[in-house]
Amino acid sequence: MLSNLMSWQITLPIALAAAIIGYLFGSIPFGLILTRAAGLGDVRSIGSGNIGATNVLRTGNRTLAAATLLLDALKASAAAWVVSYFLGEEAAIIAGFFAFIGHLFPVWIGFKGGKGVATYIGTLLGVAPIMVVLFAAVWLAVAFTTRYSSLSALVAMLVIPVALWILGNEKVAAVMAIMTLISYWKHKANISRLMGGTESKIGAKG
């Protein structure tokens, strides 16, 4: 799979342009913007301190959490679509990857962002949209059987690169595999709680 990262035809200037565009799109902290606009203060001061949809949900506003999830996904998709139109498909993959990085490490708020599940999905939507259906199916299956949201996302992110590789989309598979590893690192606290049996389940109170 790693050999496919060396077989790209994209030029360095185009790759850099795609990376910058993607990173700037991904750095938009929608969770923080929406909660402040709604008069709910700084989402970083509650729960996990994360700017993603899961932490926004801890404000008690489901609409804002859903909007955050949607916008965090669409910023990666938009970066990929815009770059694909002007710079080509390989550049779009790079833009999606760096939108993911931008969400995790946003320049505007001290490089402290979310865990990247929504932007992972958004990148898929931008470069391999049919895989979003598989991601959703795996997430729902695991969530239904275990009621762990974090585990559902982790399993889905593990399945996606394998499925892409089997289907012959090896460049996207390689990039998504790297994104999966990074997201696993960002989820290390969740993984520790899952292993210890202390991770919160979907619908759990308190």
From Swiss-Prot:
SMART domains, per database record: G3P_acyltransf (SM01207)
Reaction catalyzed: an acyl phosphate + sn-glycerol 3-phosphate = a 1-acyl-sn-glycero-3-phosphate + phosphate
Source superkingdom: Bacteria
EC number: 2.3.1.275
Any coiled-coil regions, as ranges: none
Any one Gene Ontology BP term: phospholipid biosynthetic process
Membrane topology category: Multi-pass membrane protein
Compartments (UniProt record): Cell inner membrane
Pathway listed: Lipid metabolism; phospholipid metabolism
Pfam families, A to Z: G3P_acyltransf
This protein's GO CC annotations: plasma membrane
Membrane-spanning intervals of the chain: 14-34, 67-87, 91-111, 124-144, 148-168
A molecular function (GO) term: acyl-phosphate glycerol-3-phosphate acyltransferase activity
Signal sequence segment: none
Keywords: Cell inner membrane, Cell membrane, Lipid biosynthesis, Lipid metabolism, Membrane, Phospholipid biosynthesis, Phospholipid metabolism, Transferase, Transmembrane, Transmembrane helix
HAMAP family reported in the protein's UniProt record: PlsY
Quaternary data: Probably interacts with PlsX.
Role according to the record: Catalyzes the transfer of an acyl group from acyl-phosphate (acyl-PO(4)) to glycerol-3-phosphate (G3P) to form lysophosphatidic acid (LPA). This enzyme utilizes acyl-phosphate as fatty acyl donor, but not acyl-CoA or acyl-ACP.
Family to which the UniProt record says this protein belongs: Belongs to the PlsY family.
NCBIfam families in the record: glycerol-3-phosphate 1-O-acyltransferase PlsY
Protein name: Glycerol-3-phosphate acyltransferase 1
Gene from which this protein is expressed: plsY1
